[in-house]
Amino acid sequence: MADKVRVGFVGCGGIANFHFGHMEKIEAVDVTAVCDLVDERVKKASERFDATPYEDYRVMLEKEELDAVYVCVEPSAHDGMELLAIEKGCHLFVEKPVALSMDYANKVNAGLKAKGLINGAGFQDRYLDFVPRMKAWLDMQDIGFFNGYWVGGMPGVWWWRRRETCGGQAVEQTIHTFDMARYLFGEVVAVQAMGRRGIMDDVENYDTEDASAVTMTFESGLIGTIYSGCFSGCGGKNGIDVFCKNGRLEYTERGGFKITEKNMTIEAKTGNDYGQGE
C-alpha cells in the first residue's frame, strides 16, 4: 500500500462518517488508523477500513507512519492534535470550526507554513458544480447588498449548546455561509455584530445566542448581513440572497440558485457530491 496516501482519523463520529464515505471512493487513499474516545465508534470505523484503532491520538501519531490526518472532533477538543500531527510531518484536513481561539489557529497556521504542509478545512460548499456559474454572473453585476441566512432548529448534540464547547451558531454552523460570502464577494474589512437571547429559555445547559446578525463591509465596498438563528421549529432558511442593479440571485445552501432578471430567469441545481471537494 506504499503507493497510497496513508490517512489517520482523529474522531469517528457523525462528520467523520460523512468523510468515510468519500474515502471509500478514492482509490489512492488507505485509511490505516482511526481514533476516538468512544469504543463503539472506533471499533466500527476500524472494522470498516481494517484500520488500527486507537483511543489516544498521541499514541496513534507516535506509532503510525501517516501521510495525512483528518481532525473531526467537536470545536473545544482541538487541544494540540493538529500541532502534533504537524510535528510528525502530516498534511491536515481539519473540520470547521478549526479553532475556538485565534491564538491556537495562528499557531497551527504558522506550523503548517514552517513545514510546507498542505491544510484543508471543511468548507466544501464552494466546490458545488453550479458555484462557478453563480460567481461568474455576480462578477458582472452592480451589487447593492446581500442577506445571508442559517436559520433553523437546535442540533441535538450536547456540546453545541455551550459557548465554551461550540463557540455559538455563527462559529459552528453559519461559518459555511460566511465562507461562501468570502468566496463570492472577497475579503471583509469591517464588521458589526449583534445577538440576542431569551427565546430558547426551555433548553438546559444552553448559553449561546438564539439569534444574531453580522453586517460586513467588503474590500469592494459591498455590504452584506448574515443572520443566524437556532430557534425556528417550523422551518428556516439557509442561503444567500443578492440584490443587484439588474437582477437578483437566490442561493439555496447546497441546493442550487435562481437568477431573476427583467426578461429572464435562470435556475440551476447541484448535480455533484459537494463532499468530494475534500
Predicted regions: what they are:
Residues 125-205:
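Predominantly a Rossmann-like dinucleotide-binding segment in NAD(P)-dependent oxidoreductases
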Residues 179-256:
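Contiguous beta-strand/loop segments that form the cofactor/metal-binding neighborhood of enzyme cores
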Residues 124, 238-278:
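C-terminal glycine/acidic-rich active-site capping loop/insertion
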Residues 106-124, 142-148:
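Rossmann-fold dehydrogenase core element
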Residues 55, 94, 119-121, 147, ...:
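Hydrophobic residues in well-ordered beta-strands that form the structural core
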